[in-house]
Amino acid sequence: MAQKVRIALDAMGGDFGPSVVVPGAGISLTRHPDTEFILFGDSAAINRQLDKHPAMKAVSRVVHTDVAITMEEKPSQALRRGRKTSSMWLALDAVRKGEADVAVSAGNTGALMAMSRFNLRMLPGIDRPAIACVWPTIRSESVVLDVGASIGADARHLASLAIMGSAMARVLFDIERPTVGLLNIGVEEVKGVEEVKEAAELLRSMDLPELEFIGFVEGDGIGKGAADVIVTEGFSGNIALKTAEGTARQIAEYLRSAMSRTWRSKIGYLFAKSAFKALRDKMDPRKVNGGVFLGLNGVVIKSHGGTDAEGFASAVDVGYEMVRYDLLTKINQTFNRDGGSLTRMPTAQEAVS
């Protein structure tokens, strides 16, 4: 029998705390019965929710703390106030100590990133973490990163994102050599800022066996599934993510409005109900909730703070899959293949000289 996946939950994270975290984890448990949970936060509030979900209660342990990080706190403030005592820190610390395999939080993104770096540290050869998400496409799904961990990136960092993203794609999609594209304003080699053009030169020159670099991808290529992995720096990646989520909700609202406008449209909806449900499920941001913090010496999943139980369940699902399919080992194997490491990665100028 396979060992259970142990998931540490920041039960106080997000807009709704235990009222979403507990039922959300319970939904994920129905899909992955080989899971157990450690919940950190206000034990009274957590236990009130666990009493409503006996199956979840049977596989959960609660660790009490009165300290919770708010969504408004700056990372530096969160570290000063919540280090060693907050529900967010304790969930991460459980991963560091080996008591849990993955931490999941819907809390303050900046605080979670700062605490993750401070507590878990970075993998060898990686300077900065990235947030990667699974993006539904016309083709199937793609890994897109960075969607908000940091602003700006030089060529070397973009190349490291490509390597980490390809490792995640191999885990999720069972692809031996994922295709990787750099997000740009055009596909021509002369277009884009210098950092992106240098990253393209670097990836071509390295000719990595773990990935197939296909060049530049424009914004519309994300939804088309132009590559298995699409790489960008965090500022533009976060804008792209929020734009896509907003567009999905906008289209869903258009459909709802159109289908209820007249009696004919209502009858038409009845005939096409299953097709509309499939479309709605495909566009539902909750189905792909759960950003993976890549580059850390531990697995951390960030859920949207305002999601509901179904959305939080998706984030827990992502954490389960990252552990079950051994993401950290695959990233390390990629970075350290044949004794190499990203610290030996040349600059673009060195690589092409």
UniProtKB/Swiss-Prot annotation:
Record-linked InterPro entries: FA_synthesis (IPR003664), Phospholipid_synth_PlsX-like (IPR012281)
Pfam families: FA_synthesis
The protein's Enzyme Commission number: 2.3.1.274
Highest taxon above the source species: Bacteria
Annotated catalysed reactions: a fatty acyl-[ACP] + phosphate = an acyl phosphate + holo-[ACP]
Locations listed in the record: Cytoplasm
This protein's pathway: Lipid metabolism; phospholipid metabolism
Disulphides: none
An example Gene Ontology CC term for this record: cytoplasm
Main subcellular localisation: cytoplasm
A biological-process GO annotation: fatty acid biosynthetic process
GO molecular function: phosphate:acyl-[acyl carrier protein] acyltransferase activity
Keywords in alphabetical order: Cytoplasm, Lipid biosynthesis, Lipid metabolism, Phospholipid biosynthesis, Phospholipid metabolism, Transferase
Assembly with partners or alone: Homodimer. Probably interacts with PlsY.
Entry similarity comment: Belongs to the PlsX family.
Function: Catalyzes the reversible formation of acyl-phosphate (acyl-PO(4)) from acyl-[acyl-carrier-protein] (acyl-ACP). This enzyme utilizes acyl-ACP as fatty acyl donor, but not acyl-CoA.
UniProt protein name: Phosphate acyltransferase
Species the sequence originates in: Afipia carboxidovorans (strain ATCC 49405 / DSM 1227 / KCTC 32145 / OM5) (Oligotropha carboxidovorans)
